[in-house]
Amino acid sequence: LAPLGREIGLVEVQIGAIISASSLTLFLVSPFWGRASDIWGRRKILLIGLFGYSAGTVMFAGVFQMALLGYLVPLTALILLILTRVANATVMAAVSPSANAYMADITTLEDRIKGMGAIGAAGNIGSILGPAIGGLLASISLLTPLYFSVLLTLAAAVLTLFALPVLPKATVIKKPPRLKYSDPRILPLVVAGVLLFMGFAIVQQTIAFRFQDELALSGIETAKVVGFSLMFSAAAALLVQLLVIPRLSVRPFVLLRISMPIMMIAFGIMALGHS
């Protein structure tokens, strides 16, 4: 997104606004989709999220295409990109809560950790392959990775439609309980999660600009370099989750206390490095 935004004349703050609007929408809308999956069923909400994301990404890429062809000035493109990204995030937010809830419904209490781990592993594999494939596709054009992601999402939607069983009616809750972010049972975790992912978001939004400016890269070169750097980052995370974490017999909060200082050191090295 960073090199693509620069190609149409947007500056860093404007590109960051697009990403922030999307993230804020996901944060606000996800609880609604979680409750909706309790009422209308996991599979329906999951399909809404997958097909909706596909349509929203096509519109998002279409705005970029019009701007690249010169039909939109940067300000108009910015407004349309924010609107389409927010609309896209609104339906995309349905995917994660419905998929996790579906896994919880079809697994026993003993197998639930394995089931959720399978979802996490699938996400990590996607995080490894996605940036690498996107970086390679960017050599065709900066919009090609967006259109390719639409094809992948449509394939997932079709697979969900024809291969994912509909859960029995007994699993559907008519009046799901509401859980507020201010609930003292989860408030500390919510605050910690917000701060943690805020740090991740800052790095993800600025790393492409850093690479492009420090290494004097073109837009396509930036997409390739960032794609492969994200691939190696995701691969390292997956290896730690598979090989290190299972061998550590420590509580989750102890892991947080260990990992947070390591992350701070890593971010500091990234900030000071120039090559």
Region spans (language model):
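Short amphipathic helix-loop junctions that connect adjacent transmembrane helices
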Residues: 1-13, 205-225
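Cytoplasmic helix-loop-helix junction between adjacent transmembrane helices
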Residues: 82-123
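C-terminal ends and interior cores of transmembrane alpha-helices
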Residues: 51-74, 262-274
